[in-house]
């Protein structure tokens, strides 16, 4: 998560060109911060599933139970190696772009005892990223949201809260084993 920390120092060095130009810069930064966060989440999940038999089995069961009968038959014919590759490929293609998905994934894969995103506003910033990336920050009434340096700083702060919570749990789990 060093990339996100770099945003904080970069923000201190931005020149105030003008509100419109700054808002464009801040939109890019918010999208980047949350995209890095989502990639970090995916990397943690993939690493855990690929290195821990219990996590792989938990995730595989969840995936298998959600499949149609036809897809289950395809999975039943796969070797263990093929299943592992397929599950990891599915994880790489999976989107971690909502707080509920992140919470459920960490419960399934890490046996995280509570909602990893609770006590944070990360969901707000994930939605903000979606609004910026897919709608250019346009609201339903046709106007555009304007973003400020505080929005970027808050996005960084909220991602750091979740990352710290996750890393503390992982560190404690490793030390108790």
Regions found by a protein language model. Give the residues of each.
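Charged alpha-helical initiation segments
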Residues: 1-31
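Amphipathic, Lys/Arg-enriched alpha-helical patches that create a basic surface
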Residues: 119-131, 145-177
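Short, charged/polar, low-complexity loop and linker segments
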Residues: 12-20, 109-113, 139
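Long, hydrophobic, amphipathic alpha-helical segments used as structural scaffolds
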Residues: 40-52, 110, 133-136, 140, ...
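Short helix/strand-bridging catalytic loops that position acidic/His residues to coordinate divalent metals
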Residues: 17-21, 141-152
């Amino acid at each position: 998560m060093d990339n996100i920390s770099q945003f904080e120092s970069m923000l201190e060095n931005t020149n105030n060109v003008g509100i419109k130009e700054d808002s464009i810069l801040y939109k890019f930064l918010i999208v980047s911060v949350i995209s890095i966060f989502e990639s970090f989440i995916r990397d943690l999940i993939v690493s855990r599933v690929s290195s821990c038999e219990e996590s792989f089995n938990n995730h595989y069961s969840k995936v298998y139970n959600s499949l149609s009968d036809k897809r289950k038959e395809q999975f039943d014919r796969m070797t263990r190696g093929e299943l592992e590759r397929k599950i990891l490929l599915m994880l790489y293609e999976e989107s971690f772009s909502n707080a509920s998905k992140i919470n459920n994934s960490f419960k399934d894969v890490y046996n995280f005892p509570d909602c990893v995103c609770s006590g944070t506003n990360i969901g707000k910033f994930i939605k903000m990223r979606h609004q910026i990336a897919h709608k250019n920050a346009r609201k339903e009434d046709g106007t555009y949201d304007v973003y400020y340096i505080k929005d970027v700083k808050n996005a960084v702060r909220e991602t750091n809260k979740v990352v710290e919570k996750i890393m503390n749990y992982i560190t404690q789990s490793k030390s108790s084993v």
